[in-house]
């Protein structure tokens, strides 16, 4: 089993990944990311273009894009008064989340299998009633 240091490191990584976890934890933001990927415009997409592809209002799309940007998933560039959103090319925050999740899988996979205890707990509970 992994030691306390590894578990503490995992806890620190999850805290560091809080923004991206919150960003991808919303169904609307996941939908926006998928739509942007399907649009495939490397130079970026405007809020209005994305709004046309979703059921969300323009202010809602803008709000969700800002959260994705703050989480490091998207970047934005300005051309005059126009804002173009595009995927961050280094994807550092997404890679960090993947590493944290892999660390969690590694730790959890070393824990003892407790599935057989479920039946034992039910039998014990029935016996004391």
Where are these regions (language model features)?
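Short, Lys/Arg-enriched C-terminal cap helix and immediately downstream tail that follows
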Residues: 72-74, 80-81, 98
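Secondary-structure transition/capping residues
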Residues: 28, 43-44, 72, 112-115
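N-terminal helix-turn-helix DNA-binding core of bacterial DNA-binding proteins
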Residues: 15-57, 81-92
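Amphipathic alpha-helical dimerization/coiled-coil segments
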Residues: 2-17, 34-38, 86-129
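Canonical helix-turn-helix DNA-binding module
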Residues: 47-76
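Generic detector of contiguous secondary-structure segments
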Residues: 7-23, 61-69
């Amino acid at each position: 089993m992994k030691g306390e240091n590894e578990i503490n490191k995992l806890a620190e990584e999850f805290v560091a990944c809080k923004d991206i976890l919150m960003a991808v934890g919303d169904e609307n933001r996941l939908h926006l990311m998928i739509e942007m990927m399907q649009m495939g415009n490397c130079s970026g997409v405007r809020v209005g273009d994305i709004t046309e592809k979703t059921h969300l209002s323009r202010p809602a799309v803008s709000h969700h894009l800002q959260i994705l940007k703050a989480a490091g998933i998207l970047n934005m560039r300005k051309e005059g008064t126009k804002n173009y959103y595009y995927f961050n090319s280094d994807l550092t925050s997404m890679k960090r989340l993947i590493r944290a999740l892999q660390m969690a899988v590694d730790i959890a996979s070393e824990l003892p299998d407790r599935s057989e205890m479920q039946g034992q707990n039910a039998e014990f509970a029935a016996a004391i009633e």
